Amino acid sequence: MNRDTICVQGGYTPGNGEPRQIPIIQSTTFKYATSEDMGKLFDLEADGYFYSRLQNPTCDMVAKKICELEGGTAAMLTSSGQAANFFALFNICEAGDHIVSSSTIYGGTFNLISVTMKKMGITATFVDPLCSEEELDAAFQPNTKVVFGETIANPALTVLDIEKFAKAAHAHGVPLIVDNTFPTPVNCRPFEWGADIVTHSTTKYMDGHGAVLGGAIVDSGKFDWMAHAEKFPGLCTPDESYHGITYAERFGKEGAFITKATAQLMRDFGSMQSPMNAYMLNLGLESLHVRMQRHCANGMAVAKFLEAHPKVAYVNYCGLESSPYHALAEKYLPNGSCGVVSFGLAGGREAASTCMKELKLAAIETHVAYARNCCLNPASSTHRQMNDEQLAAAGVPAELVRMSCGLESSEDLIADIAQALDKI
């Protein structure tokens, strides 16, 4: 089925006399006739619902739609994109393990990997996404368990060479996790290029209206955990909390990853998306394919204007022919990338601050990738926890402005930027 149709009708097919819109199952718990019936759920011997901290029918309908959009075999929703990335990584890694990650990633994810997970005994090596195959290979250690990157990095807007990173990961017997938030599956499906697991902050384009927080994890079902059983004891050895069940044996490579993340991590951490948020997310998904076209068109128009302006020192947008990532964008993002543009002004950080203050249509806010135009100085906000060396590696200089082009008229957006630049 075409992805446009999946956006509208995927995930839920009503029966005769059932609601056309997905139902909101706003209930914490679910009734069963016997203790034996419920016991089968707790032993993972039967499908069903018993507590919405782990699973909920509304959430599963929306997760199924996202799974269909990405071309995966199983999926789950989380309370945020940050929760999705943590679950995806921690579902594989434990104390003593190592992660290889692209250096140009969202500041919150960088902090998660480099600081928070370090406290759990998990270390990481960050690599330039444009590194050679030899440099990438050198980043691996005997205890490396996963490779991570973003299809389009926030806010540096670098493009991940998914095939290169997948090849390196698989050569070392580990999976590649790709955060596909910015392009969404409308513009890129990482599984088609070798990725094994995809994550999303559904708060961004998928919701598209700045209304609800959420995240998603999708499994391709292609990574053979049992073929590398010694690397992944959490998936390939008995889980004492479920009477010795071995996820990779019981659920196979198509279902082991999401089953473990749900039954174990969601049970213990409880970062579940609410049914109401899932319902509102689905409303956003129904128009995702249409909105992404406009976001991409506005992003390109703004990027071209900025590139030609004498007060602009540089522009990061992979759709521009001048971008060092243009060839990768043509390969992985032939239908467009996203509506986010980042740029630096010749006058440095002070000029950037003045420009943002003078904008009328672009509000200064931490959000990105939704219907309204907005902007941000990442070095003083989303990446504020980084030192100068880390900022440089992440592609986030002090003067960088991240602009998220909304669904407004591109002519109005450009006119607003022009008048702001005139004030510098």
Where are these regions (language model features)?
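Conserved C-terminal alpha-helix-loop-beta "cap" of PLP-dependent enzymes
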Residues: 292, 300, 304-307, 311-401, ...
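Short Gly/Pro-enriched turn/cap motifs at secondary-structure boundaries
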Residues: 14-16, 206, 270, 331-333, ...
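Short amphipathic alpha-helical segments
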Residues: 47, 73, 213, 277-281, ...
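N-terminal "arm"/small-domain region of PLP-dependent enzymes with the aminotransferase-like
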Residues: 1-56, 64, 404
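Short loop segments at secondary-structure junctions
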Residues: 29, 220-223, 345-348
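Conserved PLP-enzyme active-site core in the AAT-like
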Residues: 7-13, 75-308
